[in-house]
Amino acid sequence: MDYKLLLDTAVMSGEILLESGAETWRVEDTMLRMLRMSGLKTADVLALTTGFVVTLDDPAMDSMTVMRSVESRATDLNRIHAVNQLSRDFCEGNIDLDALFHRVRDIYRAKSEIKKNLLAMMATTAGFAIMFGAGFYEVLASALAGFISGIGVYGGKKAGMQSFLVNCIGSFLLAVTSILCVHYLPGTMDLNVIIIASIMPLVPGVAITNAVYDTLHGDYISGAARMLEAFVTAAAIAIGVGLGMLLLRPLVR
């Protein structure tokens, strides 16, 4: 077996999982299962929310250690599922190492589709608006606010901004859009319902869930870090919405 190729594959898999919002225990477990297929004496992984260290060692060879920093994080359950499934197939012997490497590399290189993401943002915000008892124009306003917010978030990430600023921009745009819709669209609309429905895609629910999972698995550092990340994200959303309402205060009714 090509141990270097196996290590590179495990590192790519771990990076994909961390970037996609997977729990740190899942990252460690997935990488360890791959590395233990080597049959070497030592295979260790230490994963945190911002990176990981992985080592392969055996008396018959020189040890190999890789440290990787992960700066960008988002939520992409499809990528997490795809990597986990490939890991299972590899450990069960359904695919060989070369096939595993190329499939993981394809996932690693694949770019997110902005059109699908924006449509998902619109559908999510509209769905929450309906759940909160919104009328037709309120649902329409929520979908539009989600669309504009999604463009702002995508543009901020594309420009390399920090996640705090990205969330501030997204929530600011959705607040401004919601207020303008309430002011200019016909009928009586509830601004609170529109804003609450529109911020749902930005709410750090996955980060909070992962914080609980990591803590229950004994990874207190990652659990505390993810909880702090969720708090900072929530603060950014509140600041963005507050600034938007402050800017258009004369139109708020």
Label each residue range with its predicted role:
Residues 1-95:
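Soluble N-terminal domains of membrane-associated systems
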Residues 72-125, 129-138, 229-238, 249:
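Alpha-helical transmembrane segments and their cytosolic membrane-interface
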Residues 102-103, 149-162, 207-222:
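C-terminal ends of transmembrane helices
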Residues 111-186:
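Core alpha-helical transmembrane segments of integral membrane proteins
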Residues 183-253:
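Generic detector of multi-pass transmembrane helix bundles and their immediately adjacent loops
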